[in-house]
């Protein structure tokens, strides 16, 4: 870390200004009744950039060039084109467009003005790459804030996964983490390109109030950290200062006494525009369709950016989230089969206190552009999450009376800590006829988990002088609540912990994109070296491990035409795994390999995109919960996943934005310590996943600003949470949602109704010890939101 800081300080002292290879700005209307209003759907091009950028609904754009960008041309239907000169790396540009009276048609102006940006042409700077999405030898899908708003989602757990092929959730709790699965494995989570994933559950799901976009990376990503499942990862890009004044407020209300207020403020703090800020805040409270459940949340997220020089910028951000909720998890269980209980059934009791969570995270970033070809980025981040609470649990069927659940309270006190550092350089140079785009850097990460976990505190003495658990019976056929369950707090806090785990890793990597034949063919070799150490102490059993691993990568991408490319990818990864076996054996990392080919196409100047990928993934060193004691782990064997991903997203015709995706996945166990599981489906297996979302803005001659939405989620061939030799029948999943919206230059209103058909839906099913477990999903419910931008 000392070397990273020293390098960053050195960069701050380097000489004259440099031109920009990345230009950011906002496009606004300059005259008329909507003067100053942002213009979404404007195209921004440059002779120095191979791709065209499109402004989002707030008018913002980002354009990346292979050389320094000196000229921009902005076009928008119904407005006079504007060409501007770019000099130096100053604050974000503001470009004004004037309506073209000779060509403007009322309908065309309004329809284009209210364009929703469902697609994007470039990855965020957090992914470290400077190659347009179309030219990358990897399948990356982005979910924009317009999509999230139209679907009424308030955080990562509420349907964001429906917008990317094959992504499903383990829904054991919407408060503990996103738990996203894809291509036969749980995908890693990143925030602004930084690994802040705790050892245990988490991270806490990011709130929509701070999300700028969510990027799903299919397959391993050596350019990020290669520490994660070979299925891929997702990266949450948080809102940053834009340099232009921005003030917005959003109010939502809905079913189950749902209320939410959010504010988004930003702009310059100094006349020069060098010091900028962004402040997001949110407060929410809601009850639930499940008895005795509730959720209260508070979020504050300030960001400061300082343009130290024309070439050097510093950004500091902080996130604070406080949660209080009724149920640790809405899981229910019965011996009578999946979905056999009422939707509002719970095993909890009102006498139990709430679960409380306090989550702190921060990040500091320094970027420095040496010249038009070379840029250095350094970043440090931390996360501290504290959670405490009690809950009731049932571990096995009651043989005396299966319909009576024997509930016993458990107590958890968890603290997860992550510290992450990274530094990387992007550079461009040529060797003869070859053009190189180099990415090289270093990552360091320290994770720690302390817990008094699964504490069985409610016991009674036995005649033999021992203790036994105290049970609170609950008849699933005629539940009667009101038991007084005693609360509990660890008397010495984490000093009385039964779990302490650490993972530390350090990594060096280099990736070189070599362009041939006037950038038609791109070959991307890379390699990453990772050293990882783990230490574990679980209920008195200690273990440790140390591994040094080199993971190579090779990508190929060929541009058949300016809007069509094909690619191939070979990449390997590893996952450091914490935990202890009951015998204290060392746990080795999970290792994975991905082989993939695909084709990508941009349509209508990038207004909508399509991607098709075929993959084959192998994994070894898979970790599972010890069936004899949930505090311990076992390494079980190997599996593979193969399948097809299809993604279509964007504005296919004027006014109609779509998100359509399909995934076929075939994932099986190849070897296991339990021979009966060989050939069985992997955990949370789903054979077919198909999602569709349509949003249509009516032509202005009918009703100005009115739009309608309709979408569904469909899953067929679903497996269970744990691998089993004989699957229990799990019903298919189909949910239909619809909505209506209206917007003007400053006001947006959206009404969304989920589960229109009021289907009885279940998620994350499994069978163990004679009981069927699952998480019920809400019936028909609605949300109304209103957002005003000043």
Residue spans of the language-model regions?
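Outer-membrane beta-barrel translocator/receptor signature
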Residues: 210-212, 223-302, 308-312, 608
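Structural signature of Gram-negative outer-membrane beta-barrels, strongest in the C-terminal barrel
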Residues: 309, 416, 435-437, 443-447, ...
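Gram-negative outer-membrane beta-barrel transporters
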Residues: 635-723, 785-789
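C-terminal beta-signal and adjacent terminal beta-strands/loops
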Residues: 658, 713-721, 742-790
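Short acidic/polar hinge/loop motifs at secondary-structure boundaries
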Residues: 62-64, 168-170, 179, 194-218, ...
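Short, acidic, small-residue-rich periplasmic hinge/interaction motif at the N-terminus
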Residues: 28-35, 40-47, 71, 75-79, ...
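Acidic/polar loop-and-plug regions of large Gram-negative outer-membrane beta-barrel proteins
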Residues: 284, 288, 301-369, 373-375, ...
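Membrane-embedded beta-barrel scaffold of Gram-negative outer-membrane proteins
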Residues: 368-381, 385-391, 591-651, 657-670
């Amino acid at each position: 870390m000392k070397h990273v800081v020293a390098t960053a300080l050195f960069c701050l002292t380097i000489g004259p200004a440099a031109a920009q290879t990345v230009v950011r700005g906002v496009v606004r209307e300059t005259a008329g009744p909507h003067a100053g209003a942002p213009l979404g759907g404007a195209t921004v091009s440059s002779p120095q950039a191979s791709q065209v950028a499109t402004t989002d609904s707030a008018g913002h754009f980002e354009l990346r060039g292979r050389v320094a960008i000196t000229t921009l041309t902005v076009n928008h239907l119904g407005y006079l084109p504007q060409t501007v000169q770019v000099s130096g790396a100053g604050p974000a540009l503001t470009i004004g467009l004037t309506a073209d009276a000779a060509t403007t048609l009322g309908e065309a102006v309004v329809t284009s003005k209210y364009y929703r940006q469902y697609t994007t042409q470039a990855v965020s700077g957090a992914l470290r790459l400077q190659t347009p999405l179309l030219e990358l030898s990897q399948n990356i899908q982005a979910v924009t804030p317009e999509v999230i708003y139209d679907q009424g989602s308030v955080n990562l757990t509420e349907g964001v996964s429906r917008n990317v092929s094959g992504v499903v959730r383990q829904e054991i709790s919407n408060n503990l983490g996103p738990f996203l699965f894809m291509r036969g494995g749980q995908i890693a989570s990143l925030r602004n390109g930084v690994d802040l994933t705790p050892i245990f559950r988490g991270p806490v799901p990011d709130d929509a109030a701070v999300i700028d976009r969510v990027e799903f990376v299919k397959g391993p990503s050596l350019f990020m950290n290669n520490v994660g499942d070979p299925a891929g990862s997702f990266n949450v890009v948080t809102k940053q200062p834009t340099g232009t004044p921005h003030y917005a407020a959003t109010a939502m209300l809905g079913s189950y006494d749902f209320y939410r207020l959010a504010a988004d403020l930003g702009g310059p703090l100094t006349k020069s525009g060098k010091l900028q800020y962004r402040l997001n805040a949110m407060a929410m409270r809601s009850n639930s369709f499940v008895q005795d459940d509730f959720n209260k949340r508070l979020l504050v997220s300030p960001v400061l950016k300082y343009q130290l020089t024309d070439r050097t910028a510093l950004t500091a951000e902080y996130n604070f989230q406080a949660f209080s909720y009724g149920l640790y998890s809405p899981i229910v269980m019965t011996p009578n089969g999946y979905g056999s209980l009422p939707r509002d059934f719970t095993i909890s009791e009102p006498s139990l206190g709430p679960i409380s969570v306090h989550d702190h995270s921060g990040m500091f970033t320094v970027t420095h552009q040496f010249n038009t070809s070379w840029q250095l980025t350094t970043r440090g981040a931390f996360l501290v999450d504290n959670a405490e609470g009690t809950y009731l649990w049932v571990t096995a069927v009651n043989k005396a009376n299966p319909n009576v659940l024997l509930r016993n309270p458990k107590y958890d006190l968890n603290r997860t800590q992550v510290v992450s550092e990274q530094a990387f350089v992007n550079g461009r140079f040529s060797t003869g006829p070859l053009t190189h785009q180099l990415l090289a850097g270093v990552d360091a990460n320290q994770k720690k988990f302390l817990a008094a976990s699964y504490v069985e505190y409610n016991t009674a003495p036995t005649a033999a002088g021992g203790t036994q658990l105290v049970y609170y019976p609950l008849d699933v056929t005629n539940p009667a609540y009101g038991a007084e369950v005693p609360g509990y707090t660890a008397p010495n806090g984490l000093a009385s912990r039964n779990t302490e785990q650490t993972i530390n890793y350090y990594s060096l990597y280099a990736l070189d994109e070599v362009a041939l034949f006037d950038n038609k063919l791109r070959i991307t070799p890379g390699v990453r070296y990772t050293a990882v150490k783990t230490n574990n102490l679980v209920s008195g059993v200690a273990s440790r491990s140390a591994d040094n691993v080199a993971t190579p990568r090779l990508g190929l991408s060929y541009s058949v035409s300016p809007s069509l490319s094909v690619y191939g990818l070979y990449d390997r990864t590893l996952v450091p795994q914490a935990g202890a076996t009951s015998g204290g054996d060392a746990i080795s990392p999970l290792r994975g390999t991905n082989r993939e080919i695909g084709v990508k196409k941009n349509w209508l100047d990038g207004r909508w995109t399509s991607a098709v990928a075929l993959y084959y993934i192998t994994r070894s060193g898979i970790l599972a919960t010890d069936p004899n004691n949930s505090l311990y782990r076992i390494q079980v064997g190997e599996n593979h996943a193969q399948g097809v991903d299809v993604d279509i997203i964007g504005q296919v015709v004027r006014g109609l934005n779509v998100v359509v995706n399909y995934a076929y996945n075939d994932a099986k166990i190849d070897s296991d310590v339990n021979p009966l599981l060989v050939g069985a489906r992997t955990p949370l297996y789903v054979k077919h996943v198909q999602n569709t979302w349509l949003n249509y803005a009516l032509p202005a001659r009918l009703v100005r600003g009115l739009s309608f939405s309709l979408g569904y989620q469909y899953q067929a061939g679903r497996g269970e949470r744990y691998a089993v030799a004989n699957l229990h029948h799990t019903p298919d999943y189909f949910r239909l949602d619809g909505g209506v919206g209206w917007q003007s230059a400053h006001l947006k209103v959206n009404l969304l109704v989920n589960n229109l058909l009021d289907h009885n839906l279940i998620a994350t099913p499994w069978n163990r010890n004679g009981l069927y477990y699952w998480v019920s999903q809400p019936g028909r419910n609605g949300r109304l939101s209103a957002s005003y931008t000043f």
